[in-house]
Amino acid sequence: MDEMNALRGFLDEGTKGTRTYIPRRKDSEKLQIISVMNFKGGSAKTTTATHLAQYLALRGYRVLAVDLDGQASMSAMLGHQPEFDVGENETIYGAIRYDDQRVDITEVIRASYLPGLHIIPGQLEVTEFEHDTPKVLADKTQAGSLFFSRIGQALAPVADVYDVVIFDCPPQLGFLTLSALCAATSILITVHPQMMDVMSMSQFLRMTADLLRVVSDAGGSTNYDWMGYLVTRFEPSDGPQNQMVGFMRSMFGTRVLNNPMLKSTAISDAGLTKQTLYEIERSQFTKGTYDRALESLTAVNSEIEDLIRKAWGRV
């Protein structure tokens, strides 16, 4: 990867005008912050966020992945085991906590094994924010910014260092998720095309809209460049799933991404060894299984990349 990025830089040096080989944002283009979220577990939220972060880094973008989920599955897949590698005050909580133990965000950012991809790992400590915030809200005398602005303010010092930030949000609508939503420029909602999952998503969206309205009235930012629904774990031969996807498209229109993420044993088997499809050896699967999964994943991530580029005015 280092050699590939060096080659991209060399080719761009000989190109006049707009950069062609290095896709990094210009000074006039704002940092893209994507919140990947859903209220219901099993929607492939973490799988989506992790593969998207790796894809963008492989494409040459400077990416920061932020694990906001106490389960810390994204951290584990990116080489940081929460039980052994992540200590106290080494998560995003360390940079947004309310007391005098708060640290600068640069102290919790780590490199991953992939050039261009950094991570703020997670572990159970991040849930402390959910317990601290009600106490602060009740204590009118305690100084500090409101909860919904803390992640955005923490990221501000490193905004110029990255092109894209990706939040893997917890599967709950708490204070941490709301803070991530206020820091975000875009929202990606993963949904499994089953009736119960879509019903759960509907309730989640209704609750989110109500809470964001309150946050907006209090001064929080809720303006987004784009909002998309990604169909995950999709089985093309499943009739009811196809009907549900059709229903979603009739309800949400073009906000539903054109490309679904296919259900594949290649993705789930790679997860057994805490790897992504971009890391696992093709020889470990039948060629058809691996190729179909990779083609689906690349199509999804390429479509999301186009949304990012559109927000920058490039498409």
Regions found by a protein language model. Give the residues of each.
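P-loop NTP-binding core
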Residues: 1-315
